[in-house]
Swiss-Prot record:
This is ATP synthase subunit b. SUPFAM superfamilies: F1F0 ATP synthase subunit B, membrane domain (SSF81573). GO terms for cellular component: plasma membrane; proton-transporting ATP synthase complex. The chain crosses the membrane at residues 11-31. It is a single-pass membrane protein.
Length: 170
């Protein structure tokens, strides 16, 4: 075991170590200047790009949320407006129904009054015609009675005959 450090130290050349160390430092400096800076620049660009994309996505998400809320508000307003329109249409329909019913009642009353007036008029005409017939029959009967002097029974029989004739002539 005591020979092991001697073996390790025997093959070391300090000049080679220093040369390799200097070459390594120069290589690291060159890598840093020509490879690491562009690599870090590319990584920084990529990081900025990803950050911008995330920021843009967040802004779009916020805009989408805002638009969604606006659409919800518009939809709610449209529903309320349609509900109001339906209610107004129902009220107008009820009002028109009542107006139609009222107009029908008024027309019915007018027709009833017209019919009553017509009935009264025809009744009066019938009574007037009947009075004329009664008057002419009375005159006719009276003239016949005057032509003949009859006893009561014959006079009654004569009146019945003339009334019967008058009824048949109608």
């Amino acid at each position: 075991m005591s020979q092991l450090p001697v073996v390790l130290g025997a093959g070391l050349n300090t000049g080679d170590i220093i040369f390799q160390l200097i070459a390594m430092l120069i290589l690291l400096a060159l890598l840093k200047k020509f490879a690491l800076k562009p690599l870090l620049g590319i990584m920084k660009q990529r990081e900025d790009y990803i950050g911008n994309e995330i920021s843009s996505a967040e802004q779009k998400h916020v805009q989408a949320e805002k638009l969604l809320e606006e659409q919800r508000v518009l939809l709610k307003e449209a529903r309320e407006e349609s509900h109001t329109l339906i209610e107004n249409a129902k009220k107008i329909g009820e009002k028109q129904k009542e107006e139609i019913i009222q107009a029908a009642r008024q027309e019915s009353e007018r027709l009833k009054d017209s019919a009553r007036t017509e009935i009264v008029k025809e009744k009066e005409q019938a009574v007037a015609a009947l009075r004329e017939q009664v008057a002419s029959l009375s005159v006719l009967i009276a003239s016949k009675v005057i032509e003949r002097e009859l006893d009561e029974q014959a006079q009654e029989k004569l009146i019945q005959e003339y009334l019967k004739e008058a009824g048949e002539s109608r």
